[in-house]
Amino acid sequence: ALSIATDTWISEIFASAIAGEKKADDMVILAVGGYGRRELAPHSDLDILLVHKSVKNVSDIASKIWYPIWDAGVKLGHAVRTPKETIQLCGTDLDTATALVTARVIAGNQSLGTEIINGAAESWRKRGREWLVELHQRILDRYVKDGEVAFLLEPNLKEGLGGLRDIHALQWAVMAGLDLSADDRRQLELCNEVLLGARVALHRHTARASEILRLEDQGPVAVLSRYASDDALMAAIAEVGRKVAWIADEAWAQLDPPADRSPIPQLVAPGVQLIDGEIHIAEDIDIAEDPTLLLRVATAAARAGVRIDRSSLDRLGDASPVWPDPWPAGASDDLVALLLEGQAAIPVLEALDQRNLLVRVLPEWAPVRSKPQRNAFHRYTVDRHLWQTVANAAELVHRVLRPDLLVIGALFHDIGKGYPGDHTEVGVEMFATIGPRMGLSDADTAVVISLIEHHLLLADTATRRDLSDDATITMVTNKLGSTLVLDLLHALTQADSLATGPSAWSEWKAE
């Protein structure tokens, strides 16, 4: 609606500016950038290009267009060029090229405008593939500067990884020949609606061109965006941010295929093959009859440091069954094998989660998916925090007698945060059911329950008690009951703190 109203306004300004001009038909106004995409937010820049065919007094005409816009307090991005200059610049300047691939005519000579738009599109198709490497590098640079939309307490809706700029870049990349499935395109459209809606609401609330959704603005933006709560808003933003980042990561991988890929299938696990640098499911496998296949696939991908082939991932999403109670024999060992791959397991877990596969293994996972932790200590959503804790714990397994229980404890230590009540008490109660379902013995289940129950004990003791007091040491040992649990808890505390944020762990706390 805002773009339509702006079109009418600009058309009226243009008509007034060219009134009485003999060469009025030699000019056209193009909307470019976000305005061209019809994605104006209330305080967005207005990006306009005036194209003319050798109109001598074009500067005077341009001034008659620009000044009313400035007088209205609108921030204007503007340029005046000939058709030749415009097309030439499309071939040498990435910003111009991307701005024009979604340009549209606002007022003036429609044929001239169409000529420019078609010329820019043709230039992009010819050179776009060359631009993609630079475009991708810009995305990586933004990630370093602006972080990830899904996991920041105060995300940058436009420039953060998984934000609007990534969606735009993928749209441009598709025009240059990058392959993106119809389903991925539909998903991006839905994600765009969520992010753009939040951005528009943020502009309305702050009355300025804000891109970072600050903590104090999240409640009002949630109300304007018609979410039930600020938590619901941030969960939705985290969900779409993850989706966009994952689709983008999959798409950009086309630019850099594995150097050592081979078309010859290599069996890496029962029913699992490495082909062309990706993990595939053998064609003759009946996925519905093999519940643990998804973990074998995931572990193979993490171990090799490669992706799961998209068609194989889709097959898993379509046919993988909900796991029974109890789990199939050996299933918990398969889960532990994946978790012990550490950091390499995270992108694989994300791929499984994008196809709703984790909830078929653990239905309790659903409430923690993309659940925000809206305090200054936590850098991640609950689910990503759990994964990162597991990855950190996998680096510490040399310190403990039971690496399997360490990574299981890491995965479940905050599982209660998805449910009402004290998250520790809820988590203890939940794992009393989950452990036996996994096939853990009573003794092992009790150890993991102790880790969940006391996962804050050592950190709290280090900051609130006198560590030189024998009574403190006695209190801790009495609560834990064994050196096995103490050693596991020590490693879990470090892994958990490092996954929480930079302020949650220090050499002093370690001591």
Predicted regions and their residues:
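Non-catalytic interface/linker regions that flank or bridge core catalytic/transmembrane domains
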Residues: 1-31, 38-40, 44-376
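Divalent metal-coordination and catalytic microenvironments
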Residues: 6, 352, 389, 452, ...
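Alpha-helical phosphate/pyrophosphate-handling elements in metalloenzyme active cores
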Residues: 8-22, 26-30, 170-183, 377-408, ...
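Divalent metal-dependent catalytic cores for phosphoryl transfer on phosphate-bearing substrates
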Residues: 38-61, 223, 381, 398-511
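Generic recognition of well-ordered alpha-helical segments
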Residues: 166, 197-198, 388, 430, ...
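Generic alpha-helical structural context detector
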Residues: 299, 350, 391, 450-453, ...
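Short, locally clustered residues in the helix-turn-helix/winged-helix DNA-binding domain
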Residues: 302, 394, 411
